[in-house]
Amino acid sequence: MRYLTAGESHGQALTAIIEGIPAGLALSAELINKELKRRQGGYGRGARMRIESDRVHISSGVRHGKTTGAPITLTIQNKDHQKWLDIMAVEAVEEQIKFKRKITRPRPGHADLVGGIKYRFDDLRNALERSSARETAMRVAVGAIAKAILTELGIETANHVLVFGGIEVAVPEAMSFADIKKVAESSDLSIVNPKQEATIKAHIDQVKKEGDTLGGIIETLIHGLPAGLGSYVQWDRKLDAKIAQAVLSINAFKGVEFGMGFDMGYQKGSQVMDDIIWHETSGYSRRTNRLGGFEAGMTTGQPIVVKGVMKPIPTLYKPLMSVDTETHEPYKATVERSDPTALPAAGVVMENVVATVITKEILEQFPSDNMTDLKQAFFAYRDYVHHF
């Protein structure tokens, strides 16, 4: 499985071509649209979420509600593009139009300046448009297809926010995967403790008034994987490493950890490793899951627990200082439309990105020309693991 995305924030559309999806998977635009709607929700989102109501168009690779095994083409139109027809025109335009929304005062924390240097842009908008988090809408659409495959295999995914703008969410002890998923998805903050919602929303509102932004820490959970996905035989085949790369590829994500994560650096080995146990009906398991479902780059059969830290959105309504790239004079940075926080949406993106990596690994490890062969091989392997 592989895919490419294309498109700009204010361009005509986002596009993806996905190759390697098995034939025979039940797939509809509505299934993908439900996931896109999750991404557009969440407290603290701005005006664009009211402009855009993302809906995907499938133009290849699906016939009569089932995938054919051919490349799948997805398109999401940018409704906001109607206001940018001249500025984002493909064909050459007059000079006064060309520089109508020209950007020469890069925003700290964004791709503006470094992208302009690398690609020799005199208008930094070219870097801004492609590097925008708008692209994550298509990554969620791709993830929705990946999750459809995982669902067929009995694998579930969830995400929730652990730290919201410096406020730690008190996760109830021994909360089940099912409860985490249910409560987080019903919360417009994606948290599992409703008692903290008022406090966090007040914090978001205050930060918005200040023209500032908030980041946080998101946890993604994958439930139902067997032991043995990934490999230790080469560095680039370790599945946790692939997930880490994917998480860090999400806009504004600056760190990733599994299980106890960096807290392991403060503990002894006896307080970190997970005791191995065995039961005649379920086979091998672990008494705890401090390592987050991985050993030596392979799944252990425990739930995958991966955390990602998202920096505060760098576009500030009270901008930091910058330098004009034409005059080299100090100026306040450019202000583009932004949100005080996008943590709930980022959680949906992270969940789908991780799901895509895991699905790709499964499709590489098992026969995957069609769903019948994939399911037969996967369930046979799961049975083998239970009886090892």
From Swiss-Prot:
InterPro entries linked: Chorismate_synth, Chorismate_synth_AroC_sf, Chorismate_synthase_CS
Top EC class of this enzyme: lyase
CDD domains named in the record: Chorismate_synthase
Keyword Amino-acid biosynthesis: yes
Gene Ontology BP, a term: aromatic amino acid family biosynthetic process
Co-factor(s): FMNH2
Subunit record text: Homotetramer.
Function: This reaction introduces a second double bond into the aromatic ring system.
Family according to the record: Belongs to the chorismate synthase family.
Protein name: Chorismate synthase
Species for this entry: Streptococcus equi subsp. equi (strain 4047)
